């Protein structure tokens, strides 16, 4: 099974990015082999629609679930429509988030966890 994790860097030891649409990287991880495919997120610089753009990119990777800190409404609905399960509340490193997911500690969400434009308001300085 492949999962997609929002990240501030290209490795499993990078911190989870709390923003979905404007995450610096999306790491696509094969849970069986722990092989990592880091993808620089083009949504970081989007003037608008970053959540939907990132959701479409993630859906195209074949991932079945997303681990992130937060997800806004447009991204959530785009991910759900593509059949991906969304898990919010991920913290620590990507590796730690995957371990928490594997232990069942990151529950699937059934709604957005933040309002529109959260990622813009939370942009790193």
Label for each model-derived stretch:
Residues 1-53, 60-61, 80-125:
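Non-catalytic interface/targeting segments
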Residues 65-85:
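Amphipathic, hydrophobic secondary-structure cores in small proteins
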């Amino acid at each position: 099974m492949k999962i997609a994790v929002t990240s501030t860097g290209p490795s499993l030891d990078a911190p989870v990015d709390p923003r979905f649409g404007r995450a610096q990287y999306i790491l696509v991880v094969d849970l069986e082999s722990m092989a990592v495919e880091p993808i620089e997120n083009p949504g970081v610089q989007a003037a608008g629609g970053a959540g939907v753009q990132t959701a479409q990119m993630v859906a195209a990777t074949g991932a079945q679930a997303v681990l992130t800190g937060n997800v806004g409404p447009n991204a959530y609905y785009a991910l759900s429509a593509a059949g991906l399960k969304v898990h919010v509340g991920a913290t620590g490193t990507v590796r730690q988030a995957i371990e928490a997911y594997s232990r069942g500690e990151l529950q699937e969400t059934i709604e957005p966890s933040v309002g529109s434009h959260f990622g813009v308001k939370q942009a790193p300085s």
